[in-house]
Amino acid sequence: MKIFNSVVRVKILALLYGLEYCEFNYLKEKLNLTDGNLEHHLKKLEECGFVETKKSVIKGRVKTIIKITNKGRVAFKNYIYEILQLSKNIEC
């Protein structure tokens, strides 16, 4: 699947997989990305239905909240499974 060709998108899904949701700035800091770069990758993930973003007011400030969808969870889990299966065939 083409969406997994980007290391950044794989990292985003990996971080979100273990969380109920997170704020935009949390992802930006964890992945050391610019606003524009993160927005670009989130847009691609949203177009595939792998993540959802919404604006929420938290402590009087508007925050962008990101969460992985069920479709995104299944796709990421399958991607990791495929990687693990491939790694079993590697001889050192």
From Swiss-Prot:
Pfam families: HTH_34. It comes from the Archaea. SUPFAM superfamilies: Winged helix' DNA-binding domain. Transmembrane segments: none annotated. CDD domains: HTH_ARSR. This is Uncharacterized protein MJ0432. It comes from Methanocaldococcus jannaschii (strain ATCC 43067 / DSM 2661 / JAL-1 / JCM 10045 / NBRC 100440) (Methanococcus jannaschii).
